[in-house]
Amino acid sequence: MERTEKKSIIDTFKTHENDTGSPEVQIALLTDRINHLNDHLKTHKKDHHSRRGLLKMVGQRRNLLNYLKDNQIERYREVIARLGLRK
């Protein structure tokens, strides 16, 4: 992920001016990395090292989504809708 791509994702999902670490931003960045790695694994089927990293990222995103779901359900629903994720 390039710097400009990362900045555009942060600008899209930030909740205030200097926001880089809110759950929404973290989930969006993880989703982008997951999608990129998923494309990589379609062509490199035996890359088990990257597959393990993908599974760790999916688990981390799931934990952040569960946190939002438990504490701020409206923000959770908004993030799910904007990223097109399943519940």
Swiss-Prot record:
Pfam families to which the protein is assigned, alphabetical: Ribosomal_S15 (PF00312)
Gene Ontology biological process terms from the UniProt entry: translation
SUPFAM superfamilies tied to this protein: S15/NS1 RNA-binding domain
GO CC entries: cytosolic small ribosomal subunit
Domain of life: Bacteria
Self-association and partners: Part of the 30S ribosomal subunit. Forms a bridge to the 50S subunit in the 70S ribosome, contacting the 23S rRNA.
Full protein name: Small ribosomal subunit protein uS15
Gene source species: Alkaliphilus metalliredigens (strain QYMF)
